[in-house]
Amino acid sequence: MESSQATTKPTRGAGGRKGGDRKKSVSKSVKAGLQFPVGRIARYLKKGRYALRYGSGAPVYLAAVLEYLAAEVLELAGNAARDNKKNRINPRHLCLAIRNDEELGRLLHGVTIASGGVLPNINPVLLPKKSTASSSQAEKASATKSPKKA
């Protein structure tokens, strides 16, 4: 009798057939330390039929790249909004941020941003010619002399 009482029940696993408490699920985004949804990007990769197979790290890497690009564009657009004394980013600020940055401008060269406008640019040929130092001295000399009386 004592031997049967001394034996204990088998320990329960973490979920599964033996029941017991389940572990709280942790998303792939949290594991990777990202804000962008890794699971959703994996689903889009599968649904899009871009390849027959892809590795388990591919959606994580893609989510990290997209998150980095979004953070970069938003930081530059926020700076553009602050320069214009605005608290809200609008399409104009996005356009200015992308076109003024060399690398982002090259990446998004063929992209049209709705309501973004264009970069302010005046061709140097159309600008008024700057007066040289000699012509400005001649103007000063003629301005200081009194006109001759006729």
Swiss-Prot record:
Residues with PTM Phosphoserine: 146
Subcellular location: Nucleus; Chromosome
UniProt feature, compositional bias: Polar residues: 131-150
Presence of keyword Acetylation: no
Bias (Low complexity): 1-12
GO cellular component assignments: heterochromatin; nucleolus; nucleosome; plastid
Pfam families cross-referenced by the UniProt entry: Histone, Histone_H2A_C
Domain of life of the organism encoding this protein: Eukaryota
GO terms of biological process kind: heterochromatin organization
Short motif SPKK motif, span: 146-149
InterPro entries recorded: Histone-fold, Histone_H2A, Histone_H2A/H2B/H3, Histone_H2A_C, Histone_H2A_CS
UniProt record similarity statement: Belongs to the histone H2A family.
Role: Core component of nucleosome. Nucleosomes wrap and compact DNA into chromatin, limiting DNA accessibility to the cellular machineries which require DNA as a template. Histones thereby play a central role in transcription regulation, DNA repair, DNA replication and chromosomal stability. DNA accessibility is regulated via a complex set of post-translational modifications of histones, also called histone code, and nucleosome remodeling.
Free-text comment about domains: Contains one SPKK motif which may interact with the minor groove of A/T-rich DNA sites. Phosphorylation of this motif may regulate DNA binding. This motif is reiterated in both termini of histone H1 and in the N-terminus of sea urchin histones H2B, but its presence in the C-terminus seems to be unique to plant H2A.
The name this protein goes by in its record: Probable histone H2A.5
UniProt organism field: Arabidopsis thaliana (Mouse-ear cress)
Lineage start: Eukaryota, Viridiplantae, Streptophyta, Embryophyta, Tracheophyta
